[in-house]
Amino acid sequence: MRIFFASSDSIALEVLRKVSDHYNVVGVLTAPDKPSGRGLFLKVNDIKVEAINRNITVLDPVVLNSDVIGMVKKLKPDLMLVFSYGKIFRQEFLDIFPMGCINVHPSLLPKYRGPSPIQTAILNGDTIGGITVQKMALEMDSGNILAQSQFEIKSFNTSADIFRYVSLNSFNLVLEALSKLNKGHIGIVQDSNQATYCSFFNKQHRMLNFNLSAFEIKNKINACNPWPLARAKLDKDEIIFHRADFIKTTDYSDQAIGKIVSFDPSKGILVKTEDGILLLLELQRSGRKVVDYKSFYNGNRDLIGKIFS
């Protein structure tokens, strides 16, 4: 089987490696190099680097035009495997592949169709997440399901944690999907009446509001890691939060919302919220390195009594 692989995100790196070990990957479609850092030097993404190291043909167009379609056709692919590429494919492009196109999507479809299923699951406080391999259709994430699995999302898990899990645990589902396609299976039709949707995450998500519940604030902090990273002001400094948990309690009910009320060596830095206590587990001052709550407290012994804004 001649596979054409499309991805622009390192979440797909492990799948690309394993698919390349087991199948003939004839080409990789990825995003063009992007300016990065203060010098705005062009940065090559991990998918492109891996493909080049394996001597796989790489296409990194800005637009999927007729020239790109012609280049893909010359590779004579049987099937396209898509995992976090970042663009919508036209039918003309999908029609290139005789065996069709499959897509790895990190949710239990039809739940969370769209670009941010992992972040949205954590933001909503879900305790179960999933991975789906679907046949691609013109309507976003609406294709027949070929393989699916679920996993537990723990209270303190961040999006970064789940990205790593999905990256390491998607290949076996891809194998299952490819096996079914070879046997002529068409997959399970999604129930569109059960579909829910998610949108792009952006920098507007990162500022915290301590008037929300501890559960909601914890979810936002964990959802925003690795990007855009939740934050709040403390005195004149910006504090960036990387991981949190919460306690539902009436303790400290007389304290101001957003106030750092205590430090517990076994739990975290305790912050009063609208209905309980937020536990800060990993954080940093802007411009400093990320540390756990014990190291942060040891370097900032005057924290207790200060109020986030």
Swiss-Prot record:
InterPro entries referenced in this protein's UniProt entry, alphabetically: Fmt, Formyl_trans_C, Formyl_trans_C_sf, Formyl_transf_N, Formyl_transf_N_sf, Formyl_transferase-like_C_sf, Met-tRNA-FMT_C, Met-tRNA-FMT_N
Highest taxon of source: Bacteria
Keyword Signal: no
Keywords from the named record: Protein biosynthesis, Transferase
Gene3D superfamilies: Formyl transferase, C-terminal domain (3.10.25.10), Formyl transferase, N-terminal domain (3.40.50.170)
Residues noted as binding (6S)-5,6,7,8-tetrahydrofolate in the record, renumbered to the chain: 107-110
GO MF annotations in UniProt: methionyl-tRNA formyltransferase activity
EC top class named in words: transferase
Cellular-component GO terms for this entry: cytosol
SUPFAM superfamilies with a match to the protein in the record: FMT C-terminal domain-like (SSF50486), Formyltransferase (SSF53328)
Keyword DNA damage part of the UniProt annotation: no
Catalytic activity, as annotated: L-methionyl-tRNA(fMet) + (6R)-10-formyltetrahydrofolate = N-formyl-L-methionyl-tRNA(fMet) + (6S)-5,6,7,8-tetrahydrofolate + H(+)
EC number: 2.1.2.9
Family: Belongs to the Fmt family.
The protein's role, per its UniProt record: Attaches a formyl group to the free amino group of methionyl-tRNA(fMet). The formyl group appears to play a dual role in the initiator identity of N-formylmethionyl-tRNA by promoting its recognition by IF2 and preventing the misappropriation of this tRNA by the elongation apparatus.
Protein name per Swiss-Prot or TrEMBL: Methionyl-tRNA formyltransferase
